[in-house]
A protein has these predicted regions:
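Residues at secondary-structure transition points
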Residues: 20, 37, 59, 63, ...
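PIN-domain endoribonuclease scaffold, especially VapC-family toxins
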Residues: 28-83
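Active-site neighborhoods of divalent-metal-dependent phosphate/nucleic-acid chemistry enzymes
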Residues: 74-109
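A secondary-structure boundary/capping signal
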Residues: 7-8, 38-39, 112, 128-129
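A short acidic, often aromatic-flanked loop/helix-cap motif at beta-alpha or helix-coil junctions
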Residues: 44-45, 85-88, 132-136
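Acidic, PIN/NYN-like endoribonuclease modules and their adjacent C-terminal/linker elements
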Residues: 101-106, 113-140
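Short, well-structured N-terminal submotif of metal-dependent ribonuclease cores
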Residues: 1-38
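Short, flexible helix/strand-to-coil boundary loops that buttress conserved ligand/catalytic motifs
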Residues: 15-16, 50, 120, 137
Length: 140
């Protein structure tokens, strides 16, 4: 089974609109067709970002976010990150590379191409949601 890491912006996009990120989240992750990799640091970022007031303008955002976060807690494989990595200029995003290193995830999907300027880190390919969906997502 593929191991996948979702950057926070992919989850936000999935909750806001029907799009490729929502297909990844609802059709692959939450149905356990891929293994979602998490660390406490990444989960904390998910919680902080998804609880921002600016998202309250989207219908049922908070409710959908709570459901998704609860489900992720149930199904994710949690990893203890034990290595500090300093590769990305936005240092707050390095936690995703730290998770990639310890989990040996196959893919990290992000919409943040400004900060994620690398396409691979150790064993993990770094892809936009579209690249992942079109080329690597498991198909039934």
């Amino acid at each position: 089974m593929q191991k996948l890491i979702l950057d926070t912006n992919v989850i936000v996009s999935a909750l806001i609109s029907s799009s490729i990120p929502s297909k990844i989240l609802y059709e692959l992750v939450l149905t356990e067709k891929v293994e979602i990799c998490l660390s406490e640091e990444v989960l904390v970022e998910y919680l902080e970002v998804l609880n921002r007031e600016k998202f309250s303008k989207f219908t049922n955002f908070k409710t959908k976010a709570e459901v998704v976060l609860n489900r992720l807690r149930e199904i994710a494989t949690f990893y203890q990150t034990d290595r500090k990595i300093e590769v990305l200029t936005d240092t707050s995003d390095n936690k995703f590379l730290e998770l990639a290193a310890v989990s040996a995830a196959d893919y990290l999907t992000t919409g943040n191409t400004l900060d994620f300027t690398i396409t691979e880190f150790e064993y993990t390919k770094i892809l936009t949601p579209r690249e992942y969906w079109d080329n690597y997502a498991p198909k039934e």
